[in-house]
Amino acid sequence: MNIKSELNYSNGSNDSDIYNEYGGGSGDETYNKSDTVDFRSKVIPQQSNLPPINNKTDRSHFRESMVASKKTIGAFVISDIAIGKGAFATVFKGLNTLSGDFVAIKRFEKSKISNEQHSSVSTEFDILQRLNHENIVRILGREENENYIYIFLEYMENGSLSTILNNFGTFPESLICNYVENVLKGLVYLHQEGVIHRDIKAANILINKAGEAKLSDFGTAGEIIKESDKRYSVVGTPYWMAPEVIEISGHCQVSDIWSLGCTIIELFTSYPPYFDLNPLGAMYRICQDDRPPLPDDISSELANFLERCFCKSTEERATAKELLSHPWITKNRTNLINHQRNSSKQFTSPQIIINNHQKSLLSNSSGGDDSVTDSDLSISNQSSRSSSFLLDDGGGGGGSKNHTVILTKQQPTPDQIEFNKMQMELQLLRLRVGELETDLKKEQDLKKDSDRKYREILLSSMHYIYIIDSTMNTITNSGGQSIKPQISNDVNHLRSIMRDQIETEYFQTFPDDNMVPRFIQRRFTHVDQANMMIPKKALEAQKRREKEQEKLKEQEKLKEKKKEKDIKKEKDKKDKKDKQLKDSSSSTTTTNSTPSTPDHSAFHSSPITPLSPVRENSKPFLSLKGRSSSKIFNE
């Protein structure tokens, strides 16, 4: 056997010796099993850098430790990553094992919170559970064990405004306005639901990955039944407190507006008003000053907005709904829409650049091909506000010329921008209406389908019951005689109960339809009614309807009679009044025609009672002796 070895070992002999030992020297020799080959090498092999097979790396050890330390609370897995920490709770990042979404898990340690703080946790859960708004953090659940209380919340990727402020510095006015508009929408919903937040500040406003602001931390929130109601407790953070809260004159809905104004100054300057003072000094200044000092370099609209927020009187202070229509909000909203429209135009409005490299294409003087190739026409997406025509001679009259023609639209006027904006909003509303109509139609179809199936089930049950009744009423024997089958009382009672239940369900579900189903009516025509069990509920319903119709007819008749009586009474009253007027007019004419004589009969007929004699010492008259005439006159 000829084996050609290509192994290159260094063992003291050359490659040809090894090759010949395998019988490859002459090509005719065969391999002998007794021959030995020495593969010993003088070179010591080095240790390999590759890891051994099935060896566990540090990463695998890390995963094992993660699996061992994994904490599962209900359907959620809590990690060791703390994304926030407050006075009473720590917030961790978690995973929803059902949906795969990240969640925020707020953990309260029972040993470190008082009974009052425990009630605030329950209040926060109860309030968040019944709230549902796009600018309020959603609650996903609650769990509790011996040591901790867990509240599962919507995960906000960008964190709080306070964290963003610490990482990126103060915000521009336009961005602050966007966040404030979202917060105002959430406050409008809260106040409509009878809830006041009572702790509005940057740390309690969270931002998701879409840049939308949402209110969070409802541990100090309170509920009010009416807008005029107030909560008489000092709750909140001192620098953001409204004066009526500090003075314990009542915490109301517009107290959140004062805190919102302080939050705007916080986002603009990194600190709330009076932050250079201690909390007690700040609270004193809040109550004594007319309003907090406003930052410099703010627009007049924002200054007016803050003045509306910082009105000392709660009756004069603006509400969240009123501030949503403030010029500072509406102007920024318009600017944002225009900016988005212009940025979209930058990619959708192309400039057509026509490059003509041949002079004949412009002058059309030569007889060559006048077609424009793909290289002569190019489209650029660079936006420009002016149109230009550039001519570049390549030298001399016969040189080539490059012409660049930029075609752009004229800048739209403000009226056109407003019109386009309204058109866009109208189109969005139409799309939304169409979606709602489609959803409504689907729901109506589903309801009709479910009603149809339900009715079919009821009708089938009734059909089955009446088939049993008809077969058990009469049975024809071999001699052609009709006999009644003998059934036990229990079976008969059970059959009656089932029939009554099904009939009641059917006639209560479909009261306006035909009372007797068609298959029963058909059986009435084929079977003798004397031997047929008529549906009791159907007859009762029909009788009840007939009585109601008769009652309605009687009521209508009574109404007509009453109306006729009223008309007749009014007519009699009017006739009587006219008659009295005629009589009075005739009597006045007779009295004017005849002279009247004085009648003294009443005077003569009335008896005259004589005056009783007055005694000297009797009351009320006293003796006049020794008294002057002036005194007597004065008396």
UniProtKB/Swiss-Prot annotation:
Which intervals hold domain Protein kinase?
77-329
Q: Report which reactions are catalysed by this protein.
A: L-seryl-[protein] + ATP = O-phospho-L-seryl-[protein] + ADP + H(+); L-threonyl-[protein] + ATP = O-phospho-L-threonyl-[protein] + ADP + H(+)
The cofactors required by this protein are:
Mg(2+)
Keywords of the record, alphabetical order, are: ATP-binding, Coiled coil, Kinase, Magnesium, Metal-binding, Nucleotide-binding, Serine/threonine-protein kinase, Transferase
Which PROSITE patterns does the record cross-reference, listed alphabetically? PROTEIN_KINASE_ATP, PROTEIN_KINASE_DOM, PROTEIN_KINASE_ST
- The positions annotated for binding ATP are I83, G84, K85, G86, A87, F88, A89, T90, V91, K106
Q: What is its EC number?
A: 2.7.11.1
Q: Where is the composition biased (Low complexity)?
A: 360-392, 583-598
Q: Show the InterPro entries listed in the entry.
A: Kinase-like_dom_sf, Prot_kinase_dom, Protein_kinase_ATP_BS, Ser-Thr/Tyr_kinase_cat_dom, Ser/Thr_kinase_AS, STE20/SPS1-PAK
**Biased segments, Polar residues type:** 626-635
Active site residues according to the UniProt entry = D199
Disulfide feature:
none
SMART domains according to UniProt: S_TKc
EC main group: transferase
Q: Name one GO molecular function term.
A: protein serine/threonine kinase activity
Cross-referenced Pfam families: Pkinase
Q: Which residues form a coiled coil?
A: 417-456, 536-585
Q: Where is this region: Disordered?
A: 360-405, 540-635
GO cellular component assignments: cytoplasm
| Residue stretches of biased makeup (Basic and acidic residues) | 540-582
- Signal peptide range in chain numbering: none
Protein family per UniProt: Belongs to the protein kinase superfamily. STE Ser/Thr protein kinase family.
Name assigned to this protein? Probable serine/threonine-protein kinase DDB_G0270146
